[in-house]
């Protein structure tokens, strides 16, 4: 199972492997508190895309399409997919709105691959 959790939420044994999917380390969070097993910053949206989106809800649909294009061919997608096939994976993010975050797009892609 793959899920999303904010880095500010308490880690849980149910999280399985915790993978930070942010390009920048979250402000004010120590490595101990984040308790991430892996940091895949190269799977996060490009700085240009992140800046363009700026969590503007009106740009959400276009952001998803642009980010999916960036993910196309990214080998980390395959690695995360393989990791999830072996057990629980939690995508860790700092974004305030997990449902409209890059992790939500990534989760959708990974779930689609699982079902394919």
Regions found by a protein language model. Give the residues of each.
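Residues lining hydrophobic/aromatic ligand-binding pockets adjacent to catalytic sites
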Residues: 1-116
């Amino acid at each position: 199972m793959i899920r999303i959790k904010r880095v500010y939420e308490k880690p849980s044994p149910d999280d399985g492997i915790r993978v930070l999917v942010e390009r920048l380390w979250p402000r004010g969070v120590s490595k101990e508190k984040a308790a991430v097993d892996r940091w895949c910053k190269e799977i996060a949206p490009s700085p240009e895309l992140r800046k363009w989106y700026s969590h503007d809800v009106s740009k959400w649909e276009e952001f998803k399409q642009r980010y999916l294009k960036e993910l196309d061919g990214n080998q980390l997608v395959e690695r995360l997919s393989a990791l999830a096939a072996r057990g629980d994976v939690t995508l860790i993010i700092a974004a305030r709105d997990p449902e409209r975050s890059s992790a939500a797009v990534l989760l959708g892609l990974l779930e689609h691959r699982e079902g394919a």
